[in-house]
């Protein structure tokens, strides 16, 4: 694409437009700046509400993929890539899943999580290399994330994923984006111009984070990774999480702390197992076997 075409393309992006409410940003007080930011941020959930039907469809696709041994893979550059890495990294401790189930890939690799990597988002071949490195396959779901909706790295990844039969999703903050036209489904979060012109780490980034929260949380809930509203598959790997697991057991069973602590120890810090052991008066192995017969779903096991 020649320079003039690029200029024209960028000029049409909502995320690159100036926000009329912040033209005097450099003359505002600290309070005025944060008040304006807060006012603008309040629009984000309202925008996402319009995309909930598409988000729910994607959640159902993710659950189906997980049940068939597939993975959820996020692909992005800069802020978008970092948010994907962040959401993926939170899944193992929160839901007790392995680190391969949800993966975040960022243009420029691990270094780009902390530092900008020049030209990384424009490297189309790198996206293919990165996806081949994790052996992306037709069972997986690829979610491309970019506020602009036209990041070359992400577009290349989406095209490659479609070629090999993966279900593809595009999350963008510009309407009718190039990414959305390629993907099987687009989630558009049109939050409007940022108060700091072009700084899509602000409202656009907030919108992306909220959508990613929904994708993984709703998917894991539907997989049986919670009971009531309790994260029963939490990995009790430090003092705070051991205490949380203990309180989860107490809430789910109504037992005293001493009983919860004792059973959690017997269950090797597995809160879900401990709850089942208490409610059905089972030993650990019997609880393990019963859960396995019920797809590891505590509600289904108890019913």
From Swiss-Prot:
The catalysed reaction is: N-acetyl-D-muramate 6-phosphate + H2O = N-acetyl-D-glucosamine 6-phosphate + (R)-lactate
**What Pfam families does the annotation carry?**
GKRP-like_C (PF20741), GKRP_SIS_N (PF22645)
Which enzyme type, at the first EC level? lyase
Q: Name one GO molecular function term.
A: carbohydrate derivative binding
Q: Kindly list the biological process annotations in GO that this record carries.
A: 1,6-anhydro-N-acetyl-beta-muramic acid catabolic process; amino sugar catabolic process; N-acetylmuramic acid catabolic process; peptidoglycan turnover
Pathway, according to UniProt? Amino-sugar metabolism; 1,6-anhydro-N-acetylmuramate degradation; Amino-sugar metabolism; N-acetylmuramate degradation; Cell wall biogenesis; peptidoglycan recycling
Spell out the InterPro entries in the cross-references.
Etherase_MurQ, Glucokinase_regulatory_CS, MURQ/GCKR, SIS_dom, SIS_dom_sf
Q: Which residues form the SIS domain?
A: 62-225
Keyword Lyase applies? yes
Q: Function, please?
A: Specifically catalyzes the cleavage of the D-lactyl ether substituent of MurNAc 6-phosphate, producing GlcNAc 6-phosphate and D-lactate. Together with AnmK, is also required for the utilization of anhydro-N-acetylmuramic acid (anhMurNAc) either imported from the medium or derived from its own cell wall murein, and thus plays a role in cell wall recycling.
Subunit architecture: Homodimer.
Q: Which family does the UniProt entry place this protein in?
A: Belongs to the GCKR-like family. MurNAc-6-P etherase subfamily.
Question: Additional comments on file?
Answer: A lyase-type mechanism (elimination/hydration) is suggested for the cleavage of the lactyl ether bond of MurNAc 6-phosphate, with the formation of an alpha,beta-unsaturated aldehyde intermediate with (E)-stereochemistry, followed by the syn addition of water to give product.
Which PANTHER family does this chain map to?
GLUCOKINASE REGULATORY PROTEIN
Q: What is this protein called?
A: N-acetylmuramic acid 6-phosphate etherase
Source organism of the structure: Histophilus somni (strain 2336) (Haemophilus somnus)
What's the gene? Answer: murQ
């Amino acid at each position: 694409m020649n320079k003039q075409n690029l200029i024209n393309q960028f000029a049409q992006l909502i995320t690159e437009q100036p926000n009329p409410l912040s033209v005097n940003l450099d003359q505002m007080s600290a309070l005025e700046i944060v008040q304006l930011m807060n006012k603008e941020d309040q629009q984000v959930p309202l925008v996402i509400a319009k995309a909930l039907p598409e988000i729910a469809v994607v959640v159902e696709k993710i659950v189906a993929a997980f049940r068939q041994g597939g993975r959820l893979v996020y692909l992005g550059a800069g802020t978008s890539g970092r948010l994907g890495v962040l959401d993926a990294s939170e899944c193992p401790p929160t839901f007790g899943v392995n680190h391969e189930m949800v993966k975040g890939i960022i243009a420029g690799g691990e270094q780009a999580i902390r530092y900008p990597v020049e030209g990384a988002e424009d490297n189309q071949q790198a996206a293919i290399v990165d996806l081949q490195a994790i052996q992306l396959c037709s069972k997986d779901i690829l979610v491309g994330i970019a506020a602009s909706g036209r990041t070359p790295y992400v577009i290349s990844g989406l095209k490659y994923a479609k070629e090999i039969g993966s279900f593809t999703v595009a999350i963008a903050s510009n309407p009718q984006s190039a990414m959305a036209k390629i993907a099987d489904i687009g989630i558009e979060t049109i939050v409007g111009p940022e108060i700091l012109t072009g700084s899509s780490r602000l409202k656009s980034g907030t919108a992306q984070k909220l959508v990613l929260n929904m994708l993984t949380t709703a998917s894991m809930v539907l997989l049986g990774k919670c009971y009531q509203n309790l994260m029963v598959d939490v990995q009790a790997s430090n003092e705070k999480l051991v205490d949380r697991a203990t309180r989860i057991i107490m809430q789910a069973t109504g037992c005293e702390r001493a009983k919860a602590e004792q059973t959690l120890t017997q269950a090797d810090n597995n809160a879900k197992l401990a709850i089942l052991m208490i409610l059905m008066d089972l030993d650990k192995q019997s609880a393990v076997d019963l859960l396995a017969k019920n797809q590891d779903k505590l509600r289904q096991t108890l019913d």
